[in-house]
From Swiss-Prot:
Pathway noted in the entry: Porphyrin-containing compound metabolism; heme A biosynthesis; heme A from heme O: step 1/1
Lineage top rank: taxon: Bacteria
Principal EC category: oxidoreductase
An annotated Gene Ontology molecular function: metal ion binding
Annotated organism of origin: Rickettsia conorii (strain ATCC VR-613 / Malish 7)
Swiss-Prot/TrEMBL catalytic activity: Fe(II)-heme o + 2 A + H2O = Fe(II)-heme a + 2 AH2
Subcellular location, principal: membrane
Keywords on record: Cell membrane, Heme biosynthesis, Iron, Membrane, Metal-binding, Oxidoreductase, Transmembrane, Transmembrane helix
Gene this protein is translated from: ctaA
InterPro entries the record matches: COX15/CtaA_fam, HemeA_Synthase_type2
Functional summary from the UniProt entry: Catalyzes the conversion of heme O to heme A by two successive hydroxylations of the methyl group at C8. The first hydroxylation forms heme I, the second hydroxylation results in an unstable dihydroxymethyl group, which spontaneously dehydrates, resulting in the formyl group of heme A.
Protein name in the entry: Heme A synthase
EC number: 1.17.99.9
Length: 337
C-alpha cells in the first residue's frame, strides 16, 4: 500500500515537472518570459483581476527595455496573453513544488520513506527550493539594459529542472522494482557504458538546445543537413576555438547539430546492444528508443527548416525528455541486473 502511494506521488510529480518544462518552453518561444517584472513567491499566486490591476501590471512592464525595444505599442489584450503564459509557468512551478514537498514531509514523519533512502529526495527538495530563485535570476538578466535573458542562465534553469525530473523518475522506476531476470553470465558491460554515455550526451544536447533558444539561433541557417551549402559555416571557420563563439548564434546552432549527430549515433549503438541480448524487456526499450529517437530527430529538423514553429519546437523539447527517460529506464534495468 505504502509503495503504491509513493509510486503514484512520484508519477504525478514527474508529470507536473514535464508540464512545467513544456510550458516554460512555450513561454520562451512566444517571448513571454519578461512580461512579469517582479518576483513575488507568495503574493504572486493570483493574477490581476480588475481592469485597474491589469493597467498597473502593464505600466510596470512599460518601464523595462523589452517594451521599448521589442513590444512597443502592444495593446493591453496582447500584454495579457504574454503575461498569462508567464503566470501559468510560474504557477505550475509552485504547484509542482507543493505536490512534491508536502507529501515528502508526510512520508518522512510517517516513516514511509526510510532515512537510508532519503538522500535523493532531499537533493530534489533542495533543487526545488532554489529553482524559483534561479528562474528569477534568469528573468532579471533581461530586465536591465538588454531586453533579452542570458542564454546561459536560461540553460542553467532548464538543466536544474531536468535534474529534478531525473531524480524523481529514477526513484519512480526504482520504487517499482522493475528489474531483469537474466542469467548472471550475460554481458551487460557495453549496454551499461552506452546507456551512460547516452544520458550524458542527451544532457549536453538539452543544455545546447536552451542556448539555441536563448540566442534565437534556430532562426538562422534554416537548412539541413548543410549550413548554406557548408558543413562548417564561414562565420566560425577561422576562429572555431574562440570562447566568444558561445555568444554567437551561428556557432551555437552548429554545435547543437554536431551533438545531435552524436546523440543519434550513441543511441543507435545502444539499441543494437540491447537487441543482441534478446530479452523481452530490453527489446521493448530498444523499440521505444527507436520511436523516441525518430521523433526527436525529425521534429528537430522540422523546427529548423520551418524557422521554429511553436508546436513543433515544443514537441521537440518534449521528446528530448521522453528520450532521456527511456535511456534512464534502460540504465536502471541493466544496472539492477
Amino acid at each position: 500500500m505504502q509503495k503504491s502511494l509513493i509510486t503514484k506521488w512520484l508519477c504525478i510529480s514527474c508529470i507536473m515537472v514535464i508540464a512545467t518544462l513544456v510550458i516554460g518552453g512555450i513561454t520562451r518561444l512566444t517571448g513571454s518570459g519578461l512580461s512579469i517584472v517582479e518576483w513575488r513567491p507568495v503574493t504572486g499566486i493570483l493574477p490581476p483581476f480588475s481592469f485597474e490591476s491589469w493597467q498597473s501590471e502593464f505600466a510596470k512592464y512599460k518601464a523595462f527595455p523589452e517594451y521599448n525595444s521589442v513590444n512597443y505599442g502592444i495593446t493591453l489584450s496582447q500584454f495579457k496573453f504574454i503575461y498569462l503564459l508567464e503566470f501559468i509557468h510560474r504557477l505550475l512551478g509552485r504547484i509542482t513544488a507543493l505536490i512534491y514537498i508536502v507529501p515528502l514531509i508526510y512520508f518522512y514523519f510517517k516513516d514511509v520513506i526510510k532515512n537510508r533512502d532519503m538522500l535523493p529526495y532531499i537533493i530534489a527538495l533542495l533543487l526545488f527550493c532554489v529553482q524559483g530563485f534561479i528562474g528569477w535570476y534568469m528573468v532579471k538578466s533581461g530586465l536591465l539594459n538588454s531586453p533579452y535573458v542570458s542564454h546561459f542562465r536560461l540553460a542553467f534553469h532548464l538543466i536544474i529542472a531536468v535534474i529534478i525530473y531525473h531524480i524523481l523518475f529514477y526513484q519512480l522506476i526504482k520504487n517499482r522494482c522493475d528489474i531483469l531476470l537474466i542469467p548472471s553470465q550475460t554481458d551487460f558491460k557495453l549496454p551499461l557504458i552506452f546507456s551512460g554515455i547516452a544520458i550524458t550526451v542527451v544532457y549536453v544536447q538539452i543544455f545546447l538546445g536552451a542556448l539555441v533558444a536563448g540566442l534565437d539561433a534556430g532562426l538562422i541557417y534554416n537548412s539541413f543537413p548543410l549550413m548554406d551549402d557548408r558543413f562548417i559555416p564561414m562565420e566560425i571557420k577561422d576562429n572555431f576555438f574562440d570562447l566568444k563563439n558561445w555568444y554567437d548564434p551561428v556557432f551555437i546552432q552548429f554545435i547543437h547539430r554536431l551533438v545531435g549527430y552524436s546523440v543519434f549515433l550513441v543511441v543507435v549503438v545502444l539499441i543494437s546492444c540491447l537487441l543482441k541480448i534478446e530479452h523481452p524487456k530490453l527489446n521493448k526499450i530498444a523499440y521505444f528508443l527507436m520511436i523516441a529517437l525518430f521523433m526527436q530527430v525529425s521534429t528537430g529538423i522540422l523546427t529548423l527548416l520551418y524557422s521554429v514553429p511553436i508546436i513543433i519546437a515544443s514537441i521537440h523539447q518534449l521528446f528530448a525528455i521522453i528520450l532521456l527517460s527511456i535511456i534512464i529506464w534502460c540504465y536502471f534495468l541493466i544496472k539492477s541486473s
